[in-house]
UniProtKB/Swiss-Prot annotation:
One of its GO terms (molecular function) is small GTPase binding. It holds the Pfam family PIH1. The gene is Pih1d2. Belongs to the PIH1 family. One of its GO terms (cellular component) is protein folding chaperone complex. This is PIH1 domain-containing protein 2. It comes from the Eukaryota. Disulfide bonds: none annotated. PANTHER family: PIH1 DOMAIN-CONTAINING PROTEIN 1, PIH1 DOMAIN-CONTAINING PROTEIN 2.
């Protein structure tokens, strides 16, 4: 038996001795501890359940296809109320390749009740997808394309890979010796199920946090405002060329009947796509035919025609 194995057995023996002492000196606390461990253990064994998979693209730091697995998991708490933020957990990214195609997989988990509500309401589903993308951008410092599409499959990869990603599991053993150095050994052992707990804590996004990036895609999911039908506006997209037929810029004209103020329009532009949301009445997301220069992009609102005109010079 190696020295490390002996040390491991020693610490396990110490742990059992502590449990024996607790059972003898404080039976009530011992009973509560065991009941909580059984409850947590059962919850820990429950696998995340894949619900849908979306495909989008990472633009920065390196351009790559991205698959986002949205799953429900009982380990994720439900929102405390209809006006509180929605807890969400983001797994670590995993780079993969099939044949010559390289891509990244990221798993995002919600409480089952949250995703069940999304099954009945497309507006809620879109909110949750946008929330997942924003979480990925903020947590991993990625820049994602605004456009996405639902894949024909519910899961990219395996259930086991998804669970390990969300839990941050590694193959090495946790440092039991370090855990026995304080009086809070039992609490530490309970929290040592995953080797890197920073992967698991929920990310709470409030409206204030979301607006810090310039636009608010996230509302409380139970808000009655989600029930408003969002229409796709009429638009005209054209590529302007020079005398030699070389593309110079893209012009997009969007008709927004009933809108009289540019303050109601929210515009997000990336190098490859554009997203327009207007006062919860209109929503337009387009892939652009050419890569554009986002810093040189301009927009103007023609009030008497209720039209938004966007000019996007090519990169």
């Amino acid at each position: 038996m190696t020295v490390s194995s002996k040390g491991l057995l020693t610490h396990i023996s110490q742990f059992w001795n502590m449990l024996d002492d607790l059972a003898e000196n404080d039976p009530e606390r011992y009973r509560n501890f065991i009941q909580q461990e059984l409850k947590d253990g059962k919850q820990l064994c429950v696998n995340p359940e894949p619900q849908l998979c979306i495909q989008t693209k990472i633009l920065k730091p390196n351009e790559k296809v991205l698959f986002i697995n949205l799953c429900q998991w009982e380990r994720i708490p439900a929102p405390q109320s209809a006006t509180r933020p929605v807890p969400v957990s983001v797994g670590r990214p995993e780079d993969s390749a099939e044949a010559s195609d390289a891509y990244t997989i990221i798993d995002v988990a919600y409480n089952p009740g949250v995703l069940q509500a999304a099954e009945k309401d497309q507006g809620i589903k879109d909110q949750l997808i946008r929330m997942a993308m924003l979480c990925i951008e903020e947590r991993l410092q990625f820049t994602l394309a605004h456009s996405y599409h639902l894949t024909s499959f519910r899961l990219k990869g395996s259930i086991q890979r998804m669970k390990e990603s969300l839990m941050g599991i590694k193959t090495d053993f946790p440092d039991l010796k370090a855990m026995t150095r304080t009086e809070n050994t039992l609490a530490r052992i309970r929290s040592s199920t995953v080797s890197e707990p920073n992967h698991l804590p929920e990310v709470l996004l409030t409206k204030k946090q979301a607006s810090a990036k310039g636009r608010c895609l996230i509302e409380e999911i139970s808000s009655s405002e989600i029930q408003v039908e969002v229409k796709k506006p009429a638009y005209e997209l054209k590529v302007v060329k020079d005398r030699n037929e070389k593309p110079l810029k893209i012009e997009l004209k969007v008709e927004l009947p009933g809108i009289k103020s540019v303050s109601l329009c929210e515009l997000s532009v990336s190098e490859v796509d554009i997203l327009i949301e207007v006062s919860e009445m209109y929503r337009l997301c387009l892939n652009l035919p050419e890569s554009i220069n986002t810093e040189m992009t301009t927009a103007k609102f023609v009030k008497n025609k209720s039209a938004l005109i966007i000019t996007m010079p090519l990169a």
